[in-house]
Each structure stands twice: as structure tokens, then as C-alpha cells.
Amino acid sequence: MNVNGKWYRAIWPNEHDPETVEIIDQRKLPHRFEIVGLTTVKKTIQAIRDMYVRGAPLIGATGAWGVYLAVVNMKDAENPLQYLKEECFKISNARPTAVNLEWAVKAMEAAILEKSNVEDWIKAAWSKAIEITEAEVKNCRQIGVHGSPLIEEISKNKNGKTVNILTHCNAGWLACVDHGTATAPIYAAFDKGIDVHVWVDETRPLNQGSRLTAWELGQHGVPHTIITDNAGGHLMQHGKVDMVIVGTDRTTHTGDVANKVGTYLKALAAKDNNVPFYVALPSSTIDWEMKNGVKDIPIENRDPDEVRKVWGLHDGHLVDVLVPPEESPALNVAFDVTPARLVTGLITERGLCKASEEGVRSLFPDKMK
């Protein structure tokens, strides 16, 4: 996508140094645009854990490139196979909720172990990492193709008046290599000339909505307004939201959706106000084994200081500011689970389906057990 008129993806191999993978340091956005080079597994894990990169599809792609870097750096390993398995385990456990990470690492490991020597391992790792990255880009593009008609239909029903879409957190190209999941239908509709406006939840505590979604929508020229996390229900009650589109970090094959904490409350408000609530996702985000999302999806708890402090630009410097009493504790639950019954539909690379086991099976019979 465009950044000040130049095309970028959220992760890419350095064109001059094949042993370096480059990412955008999303912690600094929107006030600083900085590119960071990853050269080791340790740096890759740090980038995932400390949220230089975030968003399920991008975490998966980053994990894939991390495995590639593990193979590149295994030249001095006494037992290459043991080394590979240990590094893959470390990468898989960098963050617990997004299923894409574990899926991508397993796919990388399987592709590598089909080969018999380290030199071929490097070639296989490079090819598979490229394949995984390009697949995510293609899938997100298709999500836009299948999701934009929903926006077009609302526009027709409103006689061309503005379609107001609410989204939570950042499920844009910054989270997905390119295009995004929740934003893919929005970009596709906007590029067709449909009058759209996006309500952007600020998404505390790290403000991925106000920092990232607002920034990338602005770069694309999409009209948007940042709102507090608790304003969505009020807007729905007064007819100012036509639809909700969010992303997901893990969705069970039965349709339960884990996404940034606060998503569940948006779904409840949408249900109460008859506002369609859609979840956009590539199939790499579907957990094909898990059935009960509320009970079984692992939910990450992050540093309480992310809740206690706010981050921003002050006098040209990026600073953290303590808000509550210093002695007050905080709980930082990073995700929640929206039950399938609250989801109007899933938007995937193969089309739309109900948020149910039968619905998912209708699009992905080859992946269901």
C-alpha cells in the first residue's frame, strides 16, 4: 500500500542482502516511519513479542521468515535438525493467540525437512517463506473482492449516501503484509468510487486504531473519524453505523472469533441494534481443530504498564506518561472471544459464509476434518 506516495508491504526480504528481512517498526507509527532489519531468530521473536509487527497474518509471515533466518544461521550448529526444531519452537511461542504463527512455522518446518542437506534447506526455506507471504497478500486481496459487494449493496439501499463502517483495532495492510482483512473490502469499495466513511475505534491500550488504522486510511485517502472505544454503541443506537467489519487473530471452525479485546462488546451492541457484524479473515487464521473459542482459545495477557501509561508525541519526542496512581495495579487482557451467534458472517478468500461449522465447511471442505 502507499506511504507518502511510495508502495510498501509490511514485511519483505532485503533486495541487496538475502540474509536480512525488513519490517516497518509499527510501535513508532504514525509519528515515525522506520524500517528495521531482522537478521536472527532472536530479533524476529523480539519483533513479534514487542509488537514491531502485529496482526495475525503478518505475525505468521514474520514467523515464516524467522524460520528462514534460523536456517541461514545454522551453519555452525552441531546438530542441525535439533537446532531447527528448537528455533521453530521458540518462534511458535513468541505470542500465543494468533494461530497463523504456529501454522506458518509448521509449514516452514515441513517444507525444509523434505530436503536432505543444509544448502537445500536454505533454498526450501526461502521459497516457502515467499509462498506464505504471497498467499497472504492474494487471500487479503480476495477478501476485498468478496467483501466489497456488501458495502455496495448498502450504498444502493441508501441511494448512494455515505456508508458508515465501524472497525476495531487494526486489521489493515499493516497487520497483513498488504491490503488487510477488515480494510480490504473498504479499500476495494472506495477505489470503485463508493462513498464510505470509517469509524475508527481508538483501541486501548496500545491505540492500534487511532495510531495505525487511521494512519493507513489517511494514506489511502479514505474518510474516517477516530472515536473512543466506548462510543460505538451510542453511534449504533442513533443509526450512524451501517455495518461493522473486524479482523481476527484466531477463529474456530465453528465460528467463534478471537480478536482485540473490546470486539465482543462491539458485537453485542451490533446485535442489539440490528447492525451487521462481519469478520474478515484468511483461512490461515482458522483453527481447524478447536471448537469452543470462549473456553479453549489461549488469551494473551500483556504488560500492565501498557494500560497504566499512554504513549505519544510531545515536543517532538515519543514519550510514555503515567495516568493512574502509581500504586494502582492493572490487568491487560489483549483479546476477547466473540461467540459465533453474534457474527453475521465471515468474509474469506473463498467467499462469504455463516459463522458456523456448516458455513465454514461449505467454503473449505478440503480443510475440515
UniProtKB/Swiss-Prot annotation:
Enzyme class, broadest EC rank: isomerase
Source species, domain of life: Bacteria
NCBIfam families: eIF-2B_rel (TIGR00524), PRK05720.1 (NF004326), salvage_mtnA (TIGR00512)
Catalytic activity reported: 5-(methylsulfanyl)-alpha-D-ribose 1-phosphate = 5-(methylsulfanyl)-D-ribulose 1-phosphate
Name the record gives this protein: Methylthioribose-1-phosphate isomerase
SUPFAM superfamilies associated with the record: NagB/RpiA/CoA transferase-like (SSF100950)
Site (Transition state stabilizer): C169
Role summary: Catalyzes the interconversion of methylthioribose-1-phosphate (MTR-1-P) into methylthioribulose-1-phosphate (MTRu-1-P).
